[in-house]
Amino acid sequence: EILRCLVGSEMCIRDRYEEIVKKAGEMKIPVFINPRPEDGISLSMQIGLMSVRDTDACLFTVSDQPWLEADTVVALTELFENEKKGMACIRWNGKTGNPCIFGQKYYEELMEISGDKGGKKIIKKHPEDVAYLQIRNARELQDADEPDVFTAGNLR
């Protein structure tokens, strides 16, 4: 469902998500593979940014948030367009998470990040330039890094 929101976009994907690469290909979404995912999130961000460096903004998301709603992604992009801030993120009770949008003016700072770190440092550095989308359900922020997240008791 989230991929449908991204039609017309380009993606950088860690190589372990073959099913996402396949689905993106079926939907004609260009995919750029991170050949060294062990180098961390920053390399995936940089590969993605290099492929879209002439765009006005870039949305970063992760593929392990099974409760993230497509409507939330759409609302976030609309918020970014309407608020005219340099960044936009989703938030629940003060906790910021993915997806996040960064305007082109932050691309250089994003390219300087190293290791297994994302753009949170930049968000904290420029709080006056961030628009926040308050989400309705905290589960949208939850990562599914562990298999037990998908047990019957957790799928609500």
Segments from the language model and where they lie:
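Short aromatic/basic micro-patch
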Residues: 5-6, 67, 101, 132, ...
